[in-house]
């Protein structure tokens, strides 16, 4: 129940990086129950960023996409790596990398432009891109790299402030 309470609490637009990661950990607990612990997850997090405020529900849709689209039609154990790093003293980047089926280049363009639709509704990559760009005023905030058949990495960059 904690996953749904945390992720759907609509009273708050921003949360700390730590809280966003807690949502991911709760989500992955549910997923690994469903998929019989077939997905391992590694966190590479700059501890200095844990109390930084960020727009809510940036990482969760990326992880959900990696699990549901990246793992489809792929044999073997799923692997995810979630990274939270400072790019400089004003920009940070969160990323999700999977060892799934990958995405062809033409499909990446469609996803980022909002022209790719799946049968499933909800927060998609284009929605994350729009929300981040609107909230932070950053163009091209989301990028996708992929090697079809091997991996996909989605990176989201945005500005941050530290106290002091």
Feature names for model-found ranges:
Residues 108, 163-164:
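Acidic, low-complexity intrinsically disordered linear regions enriched in Asp/Glu with Ser/Thr/Pro
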Residues 156-162:
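C-terminal beta-strand of the catalytic ATP-binding
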Residues 1-145, 151-155:
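Two-component histidine phosphotransfer core
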């Amino acid at each position: 129940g904690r996953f749904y309470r945390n992720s759907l609490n609509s009273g708050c637009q921003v949360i700390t990086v730590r809280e966003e990661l807690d949502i991911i950990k709760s989500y992955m607990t549910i997923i690994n129950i469903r998929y019989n612990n077939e997905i391992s997850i590694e966190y590479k997090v700059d501890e200095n960023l844990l109390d930084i405020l960020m727009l809510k529900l940036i990482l969760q849709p990326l992880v959900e996409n990696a699990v549901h689209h990246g793992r489809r039609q792929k044999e073997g154990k799923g692997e995810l790596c979630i990274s939270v790093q400072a790019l400089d003293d004003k920009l940070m980047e969160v990323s999700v990398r999977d060892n799934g089926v990958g995405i062809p280049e033409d499909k990446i363009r469609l996803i980022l432009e909002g022209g790719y639709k799946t049968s499933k509704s909800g927060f998609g990559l284009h929605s994350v891109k729009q929300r981040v760009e609107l909230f932070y005023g950053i163009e091209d905030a989301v990028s996708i790299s992929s090697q079809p058949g091997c991996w996909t990495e989605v990176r989201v960059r945005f500005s941050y402030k530290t106290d002091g």
